[in-house]
Amino acid sequence: MFELISAINPEDVSTYDNNLFVTIDIDWAHDTILSNTIDILEKKDIKVTWFVTHDTPLLKRLRNNSNFELGIHPNFNFLLQGDFKYGGTDSEVIDHFLKIVPGAKSVRSHSLTQSSRLSSLFSLKGLTHESNMFIPEYSKMDVKPFKHVSGMTICPYIWGDYLDFSLSCNKSNFKETVLLSGLKIFNFPPIHIYLNTDSIEMFEST
């Protein structure tokens, strides 16, 4: 029932239609917070795709769990603001994060930064699956993965906890959401798991 992003094949409905995909944007979480999330998901014994933002000794623990796969979570925001913290070009930024996760197959950019050029660069660097598109479950669309002209498999996600508790309306009925047909990718940053965030006000006051 739970599967990894890299297992999605747009030409084979059975690889996604009856599966749930849990993804974690690590988002530079402190090791205490990240370890808490790993503990919870290891106890659940489910498959999880982790989008990595930084090096930490905990990556070894993640790599040693066959239920987990590591993707990259490149941050292009600094580059867009003229700051070369992670590299002076989009290609260098991707390389920076691939040095942390060599051989990564999946990618989701911080802030969902995306373009046809980036998709082509991802593909050229050996990445295969991109989850930079958000189509909320309340849109009632039958979400499906698809092949981009670059060769990347585009895997939209339908639910993110921060997005959900930020909404004043269209709150998700989670029990109904997991029963939807089509592609069901969920996004959980560790900080919100650690805090058990239930509102934007709670998060901002922490």
Q: Where do the protein language model's features map onto the residues?
A:
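Terminal accessory/targeting
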Residues: 1-67, 77, 95, 99-103, ...
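Substrate-binding cleft of extracellular glycoside hydrolase catalytic domains
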Residues: 65-93
